[in-house]
Amino acid sequence: MTPPGAPKYVIGVDFGTLSGRALVVRVADGAEMGSAEHTYRHGVVTEALPGHPEVRLPADYALQVPADYIDVLRFAIPEAVANAGIDPADVVGLGTDFTACTMVAATSDGTPLCQLDEFADRPHAYAKLWRHHAAQPQADRINALAAARGETWLPRYGGLISSEWEFAKGLQILEEDPEIYAAIDRWVEGADWIVWQLTGRYVRNISTAGYKAIRQDGKYPSRAFLAELNPGFASFVEDKIEQPIGRLGEAAGTLTAQAAAWTGLPEGIVVAVGNIDAHVTAAAADAADPGRLIAIMGTSTCHVMNGRFLREVPGMCGVVDGGITDGLWGYEAGQSGVGDIFAWFTKNCVPKEIAIEASRRGLTLHEHLSELAAEQEVGEHGLVALDWHSGNRSVLVDHHLSGIMVGQTLDTTCVDQYRALLEATAFGTRMIVETFQRSGVPVEELVVAGGLIKNPLLMQIYADVTGLPLSCVTSTQAPALGAAIHAAAAAGEYRDVPTASARMGGRTKNAFTPIPENVTRYNALYAAYVELHDWFGRNNPLMRRLRVMRSNAERRETVGSAQ
């Protein structure tokens, strides 16, 4: 127990795509005292199951091993506390955030099915990472049926349900491995599963229930709708996902003895209701007011913002009452690939001599390419790209789309291509901004968080392309800070999350502002982007046909290697 007068601390743990990060934060002012990161031992499983190299995975699979999440608690939290130099007894609360929609197939006590010997060689027993896109056929059927039936919840998701979400992934398991589906007692969001492990209580957070499980106005899709999709899916809600709902900033429970042993924290401290990594960042930015579009830029980008009123926005990921901040409508959009695209390019498309020069200068490839690209005038490279290398989340909601670059000649360089890809992701964000604005949801400020904030060229491009002032979240670990702020509210240290955020969060306002001549030039490039966007994304099935060809070829290769 914290002695009277001693400083109080909370810990936020951010479970990302490749690693988990723990951050120790002082309750009084949000000072970040110490942190630590633990990389998932198994990373993202995309080719073969761990320990079962003979089990090859089809295209678009992205799985994880839930035991890796527990290792974050065991290693990152004690290390962060040690780095902070504080007494663990002074920690009063713990908050977490998670990628979403990342799903764990579990038994009734929370044990992941992949940890059971009889299911260790079954892909559908493993956690499905947010970027598992192999359920697109199921998502297509959900969308078609919902539209045909006039389901009232569909417009709140922009008219389309994503293959990344709970129902599409669950239906895929039913149809591809019915035995695993039958063995699933709880189909659990990673955000809730980790809180379950910490507290011994399974509480569904209102955010993922709304954004990823189609819960609107207190209800999930009807039994009749699910039965029409597949008779075996009729009881999916009551059998697999229905659970008491916890609001953001509330306590989900307290730390169990086992979790205290893992973390080195006091047994009985408050654990906040789980949250989504993007949405929790609003608290870290102190940007919960309507009109602030927060872009959390990493491997992908998630865009979140609050509004005072309910609006139905085409192609958005959803709108949920209290989904970001209690008492406001929380809107979500996103881009499936951003940092992933830049990483792919530097890994596969940069000549050796460029890499050698970057190394000689003591720069990363990204830094070197960005410096060279910054020397160009807007439009100098003559290129326009589509940022769909991981599909399109908003506004087309189609993960069978793919990337493209138009305008290449024999004079085109890798620097030209790199800048075009940076710009393509900014154009994707502008498409989202304009869709919000046309739907009656005003956007007045772009607030950026995440690792890509360190690239000044990219930030200026985003300001110029969108025409918006761009603010930068002060913390370099914004999701973890946001989780810690929610922990402070859950522990009763502040009246609510906005009050805690005002004391503990913050952003550098107007860090980048639009350059008028660049805005004008980018308007012309953006018009070309919109042409490509609509032709390839709305009016032509070419990209889908190419995906089918690829899948068929991989299927033949898998069959051939098995014979």
Curated annotation (Swiss-Prot):
A Pfam family that the UniProt record links to this protein: FGGY_N
Keyword Lipoprotein: no
MF annotations from Gene Ontology: ATP binding; D-ribulokinase activity; ribulokinase activity
Keywords: Arabinose catabolism, ATP-binding, Carbohydrate metabolism, Kinase, Nucleotide-binding, Transferase
Family matches, as InterPro entries: ATPase_NBD, Carb_kinase_FGGY, FGGY_C, FGGY_N, Ribulokinase
Gene3D superfamilies listed in its UniProt record: 3.30.420.40
GO biological process terms, semicolon-separated: L-arabinose catabolic process to xylulose 5-phosphate
Name of this protein: Ribulokinase
